[in-house]
Amino acid sequence: MNRVSPDPGMHPRPGRSRRGSLRQRLRNVCTRRRIVIAGALLLGAAVLALLVPQAWYFHQVRQLAEHNPDSTAFMDLRRAQDGGTNIDFRWVDYTEIAPGLRRAVVAAEDGGFMAHNGFEWAAMGEAWRDWREADRPLRGASTISQQLAKNLFLSEERSLRRKLQEAAITWMLESQLDKRRILELYLNVIEWGDGVFGAEAAAQRFYGVRASELDTWQAAVLAARIPRPRYYHRHGETTFLIRRAARIEQWAAHARIP
């Protein structure tokens, strides 16, 4: 009886099978390693894209402790929007701004200025709920520090992304500058009318006096202009503006300032 010899190709040798399995495992390891490296690179790029702008903003804020700004994002925006509108911007020191104007602005825009760390959380919560529940644009509820962040570096866009960037810059301002410097910057760079930026330019444009010479009523009217400076420049002292100024003049007597 003849024995049939087994075909060598039917049963691979154990050594060859183990080598093939090892190569496959090595391929899998290399593939996973490439995926991990690619993911790490993408994550690193994303983190870098977030951190580089923040580092730039932080450097700019640190500079503001010692140097007065020559211009702001809002001034540049007005120049671009209005075809080269002449910007009336005259810097004055904090002590050259009438105490009545300092008090009126704090009373009108941010009564808790001296107490908070840059944010009024209750007001921000209400604005957030309005945005989420009613699909409305993100509304104000901004402190003086938040308004300063926006005026110096950002735009008028009302979006979540811009609000988050505003919050980051606000934290930088509050951590690097004292309240007096923040208020000094604010009073010098905010818009008071068409192309009119800062308390000195506003006092001279609307009342023909220096910022240090404003009386309490003039200060209250200027503070009342802040939410809609260009509108009031074009329409003058409306009934609503006068009524609001009267309330601000009363509130200002109790406002805390640096």
Briefly describe each language-model feature range.
Residues 2-258:
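Juxtamembrane regions of bacterial inner-membrane/periplasmic proteins
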